[in-house]
Amino acid sequence: MHCFPCFSSPKNKKSSTTNETNDNNEPKPDDRRRAEETEEIEQSEGTSLKIFTFRELATATKNFRQECLLGEGGFGRVYKGTLKSTGQVVAVKQLDKHGLHGNKEFQAEVLSLGQLDHPNLVKLIGYCADGDQRLLVYDYISGGSLQDHLHEPKADSDPMDWTTRMQIAYAAAQGLDYLHDKANPPVIYRDLKASNILLDDDFSPKLSDFGLHKLGPGTGDKMMALSSRVMGTYGYSAPEYTRGGNLTLKSDVYSFGVVLLELITGRRALDTTRPNDEQNLVSWAQPIFRDPKRYPDMADPVLENKFSERGLNQAVAIASMCVQEEASARPLISDVMVALSFLSMPTEDGIPTTVPILSFKDKSMSIALSRHDSNLVSPPPELATEDDKSSTSSGEESSLESEKESVSKNEYKKKHEEEDSSMESDDESDSNSEHEKDQPPKPIDEKNQAQSLKIKYRYSWEDIDVNDERLSSKSSQKSNDESTSSRYDSDRDQDEKGKEEEEEEEAEEKHTHIEHIDSSKTDDDQSVYFDNDDDSGDDNGGSLHRIKSDVAIDSIKE
């Protein structure tokens, strides 16, 4: 009687234990799945990402019907769907099953993507990791892709004008710059192309289909992806990536340059309907890059030349830098973004209303743009310092010249007291030399824009300073000479008044002078020297003047 309760109690305890575990002492699949979902929810609490079941997304896309297919990329297919719970229209990307990440690895990457938030990136709103299914849910962009508007426009739609194209390029560069410089860790796009740039109703671009790859060690443009699988699109992929799978941030810059060329030319990156030498857009454009006169021929014919020639030259220069063969020769996307900010500005008659001073991290971009337009490059700060120094030095030199002139005036006066005829000849020679020196310098020809930049920022600043110094010194010397000559005239008048007194004294001392002259005939040159008593060695004074003795004797006899 008492045995039944005793045996029944242990039996019930054992049965409850078998319900929790299987024969191998492991949790049942339902419990394991419930635990994983709980862990996913806990990890997703820090983000705004939603977790969807496969059934929800299958219902939203009508079981992934062909009519809902939006496109197919390197990572899978994209379907248009409507969430039954909220009525929101979304884009569901069903990733390929080969090479699938584990659930935790996939979740970690998706959570990292969920933290990326920029106006020019398509927003990730949720994901699904149900069994072997891996799906991403994005906001739906209704305007279509850049490829549709450029290469497959609707019959009733107008072609994009030049300003709109440059604004799209600038905004796309902003999104790519966010992935390269702002995201942590940096994200390599890997497959940037016109079909992955989506446009909303306002033609604002949003980059899509980026980022499902871990990034390896490294910094800056040396950041490399771990995956060795080449996922890019031929025509957009950088040469180093196509040849050896070497993927860096500069690989994205190359792809962006191809997209920019598409916006400029209206051609596809790869068009098999064209002649063999024109099928690849970059190969066709490379020879034209070397001849700026052919740049207008690159413009999309549908633009009907309604663009600024200067803007076209700048855009082509930027694109040529981006598609360089060597990755190290390409600019940073941040520099590309800064350069495009100028081209995307509102214009009046093809000229921007305001001209910014551009600042680049890499000098190569500044050099490339300066070859086409001097308005984008400001004079180096060193030139301003040199100008200040030259003005100061010119002031010092002018003061020195004035001092020299004051000294020369005294000497000038002494010379004119002794010899009138020699000074008259000197005045004539000085006036002739001054007339030759006062000829103005030839003006600098800045009609050629490409040449004016070189003249303005390398040579003309120094030449103008030197010419200004010479002109200022010449003018000061001329004014000093005029004042000296006026003073000499007054002194000569005084000398004439005292001439009569000197003649009387000379008459009294006539005999003494004759004796002095006779004694001087013993010299070799038979001459008398008058010394100015100045040992300074200056060219303007201190020289010895000679008067022939026979002339002096004749004057005395008279």
Curated annotation (Swiss-Prot):
CDD domains from the UniProt entry: STKc_IRAK (cd14066)
Phosphothreonine sites (modified residues): T53, T233
EC number: 2.7.11.-
A Pfam short name: Pkinase
Coiled-coil regions listed in the entry: none
Enzyme class: transferase
Tissue: Expressed in mature pollen and in germinating pollen tubes.
UniProt-recorded Gene Ontology molecular function terms: ATP binding; protein serine/threonine kinase activity
KO phenotype (gene knockout): No visible phenotype. Lip1 and lip2 double mutants have a reduced male transmission.
Provenance organism: Arabidopsis thaliana
Keywords: ATP-binding, Cell membrane, Kinase, Lipoprotein, Membrane, Nucleotide-binding, Phosphoprotein, Serine/threonine-protein kinase, Transferase
Protein name: Receptor-like kinase LIP2
Result for mutant: C3S: Loss of membrane localization
